[in-house]
Amino acid sequence: MVNFYDDVDESKSHGEFPLIPVVLQNSSELSVRTIPTGNEIIESVHLTKWLRKYRNALASQLDRYEKGWQSKIANFRLQVQHVINYSRKNIFNVDSENKHTVVPGSLIALGAFFSGSIAVNRSNWGAKRLIFGHKSSILEKLCTSLPSRILLPWVLAAATFKYWAPQTSQNLVNATENDLLPADFVKSYHNTWKRIYEEGYVAKKCDLKRQIDQTLQKNIRYAREQLYEKLEQA
């Protein structure tokens, strides 16, 4: 049997041996230290350095993640507060609408959006129940077309909210145009709307109204002249 304990007399030691073998105490790869409890422990020098380095790196990485997360939370809170302050100043700045019409108008607009979503769903027009004998009506084709499926729910919601809170809805449109959309895009669609609606629809409507008015005036004048001639002949 190999004695690692440097010629300890077992007959006089009463079963007590050194806790740290001499062979391990003299090794440069190992170190012996006393922990706060009073016990001596053996630890690998290189392993301890590697573990300490890994632990410090992990703690530093976690600290960076925590600081980054806290910074993101702080920035998010600032952004939310900025949005709230901006909305109060530029959109929801009409006290009468804020107190009476904005909330019910928003709920009814939400209902209008869901109603539009139901109206543009093909399955709600009986297409699945009558696959072979179903004949699509003009209204069904109009409601279930691709542009209607994209625009109709939003148009209904916007029109409903505008009816209930006209000034707030206009503020929302102005804020979107001024601060969210590119200026060139806003100018382009304003010109397109002016050309289609004002110079197109409105101009043709006024022209048609003027033509009808002129035609009515001519017909009335002709009828009066005919009546006057008949009365003179009589």
UniProtKB/Swiss-Prot annotation:
Keyword RNA-binding present in the record's keywords: the answer is no
Positions in the Mitochondrial matrix compartment = 121-141
Which residues form each disulfide bond in the chain?
A: none
Tell me where in or outside the cell this protein is found: Mitochondrion inner membrane
Q: Which residues lie on this side of the membrane: Mitochondrial intermembrane?
A: 1-100, 162-234
What membrane topology is given?
A: Multi-pass membrane protein
Going by the UniProt record, its keywords in alphabetical order are: Membrane, Mitochondrion, Mitochondrion inner membrane, Transmembrane, Transmembrane helix
Residues passing through the membrane, by range: 101-120, 142-161
Biological role stated in the UniProt entry: Component of the MICOS complex, a large protein complex of the mitochondrial inner membrane that plays crucial roles in the maintenance of crista junctions, inner membrane architecture, and formation of contact sites to the outer membrane.
Q: What does the subunit comment say?
A: Component of the mitochondrial contact site and cristae organizing system (MICOS) complex.
- Which family does the record claim for this protein? Belongs to the apolipoprotein O/MICOS complex subunit Mic27 family.
- What name goes with this protein? MICOS complex subunit MIC27
- Gene expressing this chain: MIC27
